């Protein structure tokens, strides 16, 4: 165990690399972070209701040729609970992790590739737009989608609220584990409503980004069911089509999967990340 700038770092060896586990105190919350691997730096941001433990397969594959930083958002995994689960609070978590990584002792000084899944993709876009020069490129996995229609419409809101309440109840069984999620059903619903608003204006954020962007999207985000699922899937594809019309330099890959693609298609995603363009040699500014 060692101390660096207020961070407590615990070392453990996991083949084929050493993983450093440390915490960052930010905004009254303790953020759990892990770092290991070799190659160009990469920060992997999980999504709502997912943890770095859930993303272990993808992170392990990426560590073969990247120096990978993973972490748990507030109220998730090994990070502490919080009184605020707004989009801005989660954005602050990602910003704190990135700032710590860039200033850490022994770092290369190179700007990292920023990879975000679901909510993590939206956070990555907002961070990149607000801090030009801080990253080498973006890989966005099934998120940050400028969908033409909101998902939380009055006709489906009761069903979605019931689904999130049930999800929060089931997640109670994971409390005390690296896969715990502490948000209530109402907090999950509130954040999803905020994400609808965020995505309605996210095209403006894309216009402010000057690094390469790659999208990895699911063909059936909401699954293969009828009715609402098909409507959501059409809206999802329409959002990406809208994005590439306005930002044709963005590369897009589609995987035959639902929104759980990071868990079911980790090898394919890792390969796409490896081939993602980035500003080689770019240093953080």
Give residue spans per PLM region.
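Short beta-to-alpha linker loops that shape the active-site pocket of alpha/beta-hydrolase fold enzymes
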Residues: 72-76, 144, 257-258
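Conserved serine/cysteine hydrolase catalytic core
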Residues: 176-256, 262
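Conserved HGGG/HGGXW glycine-rich cap/lid loop of the alpha/beta-hydrolase fold
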Residues: 29-80, 130
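Active-site loop/oxyanion-hole signature of alpha/beta-hydrolase fold enzymes
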Residues: 34, 60, 70-115, 157
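Gly/Ala-rich beta-loop-alpha elbow adjacent to hydrolase catalytic centers
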Residues: 116-120, 124
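N-terminal cap/lid segment of alpha/beta-hydrolase-fold proteins
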Residues: 2-30
């Amino acid at each position: 165990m060692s101390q660096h700038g207020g961070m407590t770092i615990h070392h453990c060896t996991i083949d084929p690399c050493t993983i450093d586990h440390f915490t960052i105190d930010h905004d009254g919350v303790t953020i759990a972070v892990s770092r290991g691997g070799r190659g160009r730096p990469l920060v992997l941001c999980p999504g709502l209701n997912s943890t770095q433990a859930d993303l272990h397969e993808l992170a392990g594959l990426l560590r073969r040729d990247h120096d990978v930083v993973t972490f748990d958002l507030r109220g998730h995994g090994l990070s502490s609970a919080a009184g605020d689960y707004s989009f801005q609070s989660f954005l602050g978590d990602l910003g704190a992790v990135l700032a710590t990584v860039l200033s850490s002792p022994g770092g290369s000084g190179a700007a990292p590739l920023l990879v975000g899944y679901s909510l993590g993709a939206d956070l990555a876009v907002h961070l990149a737009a607000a801090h030009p020069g801080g990253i080498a490129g973006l890989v966005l996995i099934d998120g940050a989608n400028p969908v033409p229609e909101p998902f939380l419409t009055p006709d489906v809101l009761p069903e979605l609220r019931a689904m999130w309440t049930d999800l929060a109840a089931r997640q109670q069984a994971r409390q005390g584990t690296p896969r715990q999620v502490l948000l209530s059903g109402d907090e999950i619903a509130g954040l999803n409503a905020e994400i609808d608003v965020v995505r309605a204006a996210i095209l403006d954020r894309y216009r402010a980004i000057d690094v390469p962007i790659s999208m990895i999207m699911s063909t059936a985000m909401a699954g293969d069911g009828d009715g609402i699922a098909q409507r959501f899937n059409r809206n999802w594809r329409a959002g990406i089509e809208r994005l590439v019309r306005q930002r044709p330099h963005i590369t897009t890959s589609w995987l035959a999967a639902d929104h759980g693609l990071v868990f079911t298609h980790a090898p394919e995603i890792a390969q796409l990340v490896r081939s993602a363009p980035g500003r080689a040699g770019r240093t953080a500014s």
